[in-house]
Amino acid sequence: MYHGWTDPQVSPMLSVTYYDNVLKAVGKEKAANSIALFMMPGMNHCQGGDGPDTFDKVKVLEQWVEQGKKPAQIIASHMTNGQVDKTRPLCPYPQVAKYKGTGSMNDAANFSCVADAR
């Protein structure tokens, strides 16, 4: 699953609540084999917005289902005028992408997925 944090049409918290309810219903360990949630900072409803909104969804699913490689992160990109101007890791909820403190803030390589400090 993925959902944009700035979705103006469907509250992002609906996806968070659904995901949390699945974990409660079947247990974290069992659910981990079949569900993951990636929240996308700055993405509107399915696409658009200031944040990275583009990644190969089919490839991610194929690697997980067919090869058993559950994504630890997904690299998404943002484009302006047909050019990639930003990449960012999408982290499995509840992790978030944290800037490492050096390098371009528009380069996914300068971020790591960490537990949300809230």
What do the PLM-derived regions correspond to, one by one?
Residues 1-118:
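C-terminal His-loop and adjacent cap/lid subdomain of alpha/beta-hydrolase
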